[in-house]
């Protein structure tokens, strides 16, 4: 197997609630990447900032997140690096802590966080609906898992992705 991916990690500090500013920063970073970078990865809940608390319960905020994610979709139409980015999303009547995989002008996959913490400022069980155990995603012919934060410590999640 000679397949390889070049991945850039965007270790950015998003501002909670500054959805447009966070997206602009990520698009700017992506525009400066070398053409040989296959994937740009941003942190959990990067789009909204974290910890998000009750802001994510507002319908207008979730609508803004959705419209700003579309800007990321549009910028990937250049067929350069894919983007993996964390954002809250509305799924029917529930809100999920998700990761979006965006490539070639499309959202090719959405994965939801399974293991929601409920300690201190991490009040995710009150805010988010638990995701299901997710399968792997494939980018450029390479299959890999996308556990989100505490999912890494959950044996059930890792077994599903292995």
For the regions a language model picked out, list residue spans one by one.
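Enzyme catalytic cores with a strong preference for nitrogen-chemistry domains
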Residues: 1-162
